[in-house]
């Protein structure tokens, strides 16, 4: 059984026991969070109807609330003017472990 959930602005395919990275959530380590479900597949049975999906919930436990993504370098350069700028960015992430699809 797996589900497609909306987590941190993205959609993720999850099963029970999966550990996923999502954009920073307002939750502390050890907290339980619940994600809205877009699709559930259980063997040959596919659930898409909004009324049926309202009954389904995906629960996850926050493993790490202070993770960071990879460093991204941004460079800006203007020829012949001496203008150059270098900047970096690391996205703040939350690591969650899926505990239940019910």
Swiss-Prot record:
GO terms for biological process: translation. GO terms for cellular component: cytoplasm; ribonucleoprotein complex; ribosome. InterPro entries: bL21-like, bL21-like_sf, Ribosomal_bL21, Ribosomal_bL21_CS. GO terms for molecular function: rRNA binding; structural constituent of ribosome. The keyword Protease does not apply. Keywords: Ribonucleoprotein, Ribosomal protein, RNA-binding, rRNA-binding. It comes from the Bacteria. This protein binds to 23S rRNA in the presence of protein L20. HAMAP family: Ribosomal_bL21. Belongs to the bacterial ribosomal protein bL21 family. This is Large ribosomal subunit protein bL21. It comes from Bifidobacterium longum subsp. infantis (strain ATCC 15697 / DSM 20088 / JCM 1222 / NCTC 11817 / S12). The gene is rplU.
